Curated annotation (Swiss-Prot):
GO MF term list: ATP binding; CMP kinase activity; dCMP kinase activity
Catalytic reaction(s) noted: CMP + ATP = CDP + ADP; dCMP + ATP = dCDP + ADP
Entries under Pfam families matching the protein: Cytidylate_kin
Enzyme kind, highest EC tier: transferase
Subcellular location: Cytoplasm
Name used for this protein in its record: Cytidylate kinase
Amino acid sequence: MTVQIITIDGPSGSGKGTLAAKLAAYYQFHLLDSGALYRLLGLSLHKHDLLEKLDSHLDECVNYARQLNIKFETSAEGTLVFLDGEDVTQTIRTERVGEYASKVAAIPELRQALFERQRAFAQTPGLVADGRDMATSIFPEANAKIYLTASAESRAERRVKQLQGMGLDAKINDILANIQARDKRDMEREVAPLKPAGDAYIIDSSELTIDQVFKLMVDYVNSRTVSN
């Protein structure tokens, strides 16, 4: 049986995670949050004092990537994420760990180590894959390819609200600077830079609600022969 694959790529804070989860629930597909994998690897390398030694200890870092002890659990509150048995669901969503992930994602050998791990998520009846290079690198054969973007300013405002909702302190200027720096790093890296696939459906969510974007996505996905 052919596995239907929907990819959602785009920059940090564009709403990919929320919409990918909604699509996965709507179509009853599996869900891959590839950003969580990079955040988990970045956090693990930081805990083992390897994040600042990526160049000199690359082989060791690659081994950590291949043996990463992670688990995803679906609960009433959403998806819980565990690293080495510890619940790190909120920890990996902090700006600090986002920076770790961006550093890790810039290393070709670490991206390759996570490649097969991501491919393994493609199981029947289908998969919604959320990330930066899902359509361009990991699942180029995807049935439906979406590139979700928004202005840096609107993404910063959303991120501040998200962090404040988690009880964390957040300053708009700091968040905006971080987003702009990550955009630059993600778009300029040598391997799998952030960009839409040539056949991607591009949505700018700057002035749209989650429900409006979701409807656009469902209409597009259905037009690509993925049926509910």
